[in-house]
Each structure stands twice: as C-alpha cells, then as structure tokens.
A protein has these predicted regions:
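Active-site diphosphate/adenylate-binding microenvironment
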Residues: 17-65
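Glycine-rich beta-alpha junction loops
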Residues: 44-47, 119-121, 178-183
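Generic beta-sheet signal
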Residues: 38-42, 83-87, 112, 171-177
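Thiamine diphosphate
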Residues: 49-118
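N-terminal low-complexity segments that are often proline-rich with Ser/Thr-Pro
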Residues: 1-16
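Conserved thiamine diphosphate
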Residues: 129-164
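Glycine/aspartate-rich loop-and-adjacent alpha/beta segment that forms the canonical ThDP
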Residues: 22, 54-56, 169-218
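Long, charge-dense
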Residues: 117-128
Length: 218
C-alpha cells in the first residue's frame, strides 16, 4: 500500500473513531431525566444555558464560578440525604480543584449523581484545550481518589444506559461523558444568576419547610 493510500486510510479511521467517541452536548442533556424532587446543580456557561432550556425548573441551582461544584454538590447531598442531588460539571471545572475528588472518595453521599461533561476544552474562553485532550483521565483520577465505580462513556448508547442506571439506583455515581466541542451560540440565559439563586432558595425553603435566608430575598 502506498504512503498516500495509507495516509487516507488512517484519516478515515481517525474520523470514524472520533464520531463514535463523541456526541453533541445538548443531545446528551436531553437523556438526563431527573425526578421532581431532585436538586440539580449545574456548572456555568453553556452547561447552564443548555440545561435551563432542556429542563427549566425551580429545583435547579446554577453556578457562577469554577472549581467548587463537587464540594457544593456534596454538601447539598449531605444536608438533604432524602433527595437526589444531580451535579452537571465540566472537565475544566473539575481540573481546577482535583483535591475535591479525594474528599468525594472519603465522604461519599449515596444520593449524589455526578456527570462530568468533557469536551476537552475551555469553551467559554475560546476553546483552549484542557489536559483531558492529552493524557489526563478524570475518571481514573477519581477512582484513584477512592470514588468507586467512576467511569467514562464515549457514545450515546453507553451514556443513556449509564444515566438511566445512575438515576434509578441507590449509591453515588461519577460518570465522565465525552462530548464534542459545541458549535454555534448557546441559548440565552432566561434568568440572571441572582434571580436563579433566589428562585432555588425559595424552592428549597418551601419544599423543606425551613428558612435559609432570614433577610428578604428577591
């Protein structure tokens, strides 16, 4: 086989592997069907904007920063053990505070379900590659930190199966979802961060019959 033909064949194989490995982020979100009493904690940027469109609900709390999502979600799961807490995180955010994985491994919460959408890029700042585009394996790091059953899925069929099982069974889950870098604009946020947080607080206060903020919040 000539070098040119070999080169074309390798390119075709690479394309097939890439298509099989990755799928659209927005498409993936539609497969996460959470219960009416569940708490959703969602990373910032496109993750929040897409989720607000796919699943608008008072029980969503949206982040305004990076790196602190796992600690906050773990805290929510600990103080609300009777409710399922679903964290939608990203590779860039998890990489910013890897030490959170050791805490997660040491103090697991059976009602916490974590999905890390890994597009191997910092999309919000221009698509610069994260270290997961090279050799870093977030699920492997989580396993080494004591997070049992942490795994990576790379196609829609595997994701649908993993998401369905995670949301239907007891026990903490940690699923890294390989998705393609999104193209085009994301849906515009319907609420400001302050409005969304206020709505979430009112929702928890009403459903838990507890006061969280003693001052008036709007």
């Amino acid at each position: 086989m000539g070098l040119i033909k070999l080169g074309k064949l390798l390119i075709q194989v690479a394309i097939v592997v890439a298509v099989a490995r990755e799928f659209a982020f927005a498409q993936a979100l539609q497969e996460i069907r959470i219960g009416s009493s569940a708490i959703g904690f969602i990373s910032l940027g496109r993750t929040a904007e897409e989720w607000a469109t796919v699943c608008p609900r008072d029980g969503n709390m949206f982040s305004s920063g990076m790196g602190n999502h796992i600690p906050i979600a773990l805290g929510l799961a600990k103080v609300l053990p009777h409710r399922q807490v679903i964290l939608l995180d990203t590779d860039g955010s998890v990489l910013m505070l890897l030490s959170a994985l050791t805490t997660l491994g040491a103090y697991p919460a059976p009602n916490l379900k974590i999905f890390v959408f890994d597009n191997e890029a910092y999309e919000g700042t221009g698509g610069q590659p994260t270290d997961t585009s090279r050799t870093t394996d977030i699920a492997a790091i989580a396993v080494a930190a004591g997070v049992r059953g942490a795994a990576t899925v790379q196609d829609m069929a595997s994701f649908k199966s993993a998401a369905g099982e995670a949301l239907a069974t007891d026990g903490m889950t940690f699923t890294v979802v390989k998705v393609e870098l999104a193209k085009g604009p994301s849906p515009r946020a319907r609420l400001s961060h302050r409005e969304g947080l206020s709505r979430f607080v009112r929702y928890v206060e009403a459903t838990e019959k507890k006061t969280i903020l003693h001052t008036e919040h709007t």
